[in-house]
Amino acid sequence: MKSPSILVLSWVLVAALLLCCAGIAAAQQTAAPASAAPSRDAQSGAPATLPVLRLTLEDALARARKNSAQFQSSQTDAAIARQDRYQAAAALLPSVTYNNEALYTQLDRSGNVRLIANNAAQEYISQANVHESIDLVSISAFRRSSAASALAKARAEIASRGLVVTVVQSYYAVAAAQQKLEAAKKNGEEGDRFLKLTQDLEKGGEVAHSDVIKAELQMQDRRRQLLEAQLGLLNARLDFAVLIFSDFNDNFELAEDLHASVPLPTIAEVQQRAARDNPDLRAALAAVQQAGHDVTGARGGYLPSLSFDYWYGIDAPQFAVNGSNGSNLGSSAVATVNIPIWNWGATQSRVKQAELRRTQAQRELSLAQRRLVAEIQSLYAEADTALNELSGLSRSAELSAEGLRLTTLRYKGGEATVLEVVDAQTTFAQANAAYQDGAVRYRVALANLQTLTGVLTTP
């Protein structure tokens, strides 16, 4: 039989062991979140990768319009003109007002009559009034505001013309810079290969050291051209980003191919559509219509005007529907015809003034028509020339690439000189750059032509 002291000591040891195990477990649980916290912090601190924004030309134009203060100003003017038209239309419709008045008149106890228009010492008026006025001036004002709204809309499209051409040129300049960078990389690789080739041939005693020097100079020139192409692409992307993004963003790519086949419409199609949708022509025509309505409105000053008023409510000594002698409610109606007689020639002056404006608007319309015909021929010739040259430039780029390959092979066989290879490399670089510039020229010329027909200027 164990002694009581041994039993007590055993229980103390067991309790101590349990306490130690519990402390270790608690320490492990505390350390686990602490070790997990830096992981979460690291994950939260890592910047999220935004998806690359693919931009079509229409997307770029829409974004540029939102960021252009000049275009937004013209849009605001067009919106204001639409509200003017709404207000002019509302002026032709009956209006309803509700009048409330309280009048106090001091009575004359001597019997003299004064303030005869007042009906009693205390008079209360609470009436609804329906008013309608009809005259030629108001009708002409509505028609004028309609023409002014069309004029403001056309001017908004005119304001966007320069913006459209700028965006198109910047958009395809980025595409051309990308193509030039790819060509510069190929030229750089070709320069490195040619330098390696001349070095190998020099070791074999087949060429002189001067060929190696010439190849190395050419290689250094190609590397400088590669750096310039990288800088050109960077500047083109920055200029384009400033133009279309409200907050600077360089994380984008172009969705349209610079060398995609875009047919040129016939000149008859361009002329037909320009006659119908050209913003300058529509603006000039709307200005003539507006001036014509001004003349009609000014001549309306010679004619009578008609107004009609209808009242319903109370006009009584008590502010109540029912008075001491019955109902205070009543109604009345008034029709008025105002006939102009004499105003010292002011109406004649306004008519003359409006006719002068109409004559000037007609002159500007004739000028816009002649200018449109000239611009169509000029811009169409520009686009047609650029398109015809583009096929030749494409062929030149292909031939220069093939010529470079063949010249390099001839140099390997000892049939060509190093100068011929260098000349072939230079020709290839120039032909490729000219091809990219020609593609941009055609796109810009086509955009200029499309602005005449309202294709790209209409949001």
Segments (PLM) and residue ranges:
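Small/polar, glycine/serine/threonine/aspartate-rich low-complexity segments that form flexible
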Residues: 42-53, 99-134, 253-267, 296, ...
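Periplasmic alpha-helical coiled-coil/stalk elements that build and connect Gram-negative outer-membrane
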Residues: 2-3, 162-275, 382, 386, ...
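Bacterial Sec-pathway N-terminal export signals of envelope proteins
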Residues: 27-101, 107, 254-289, 340-341, ...
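Short segments within alpha-helical structural elements
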Residues: 90, 221-248, 397-455
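Transmembrane beta-barrel architecture of outer-membrane proteins
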Residues: 123-125, 169, 214, 330-332, ...
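A glycine-/polar-enriched beta->alpha junction
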Residues: 62-72, 79-95, 128-144, 154-161, ...
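Acidic, low-complexity, intrinsically disordered peripheral segments
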Residues: 2, 13-19, 26-35, 49, ...
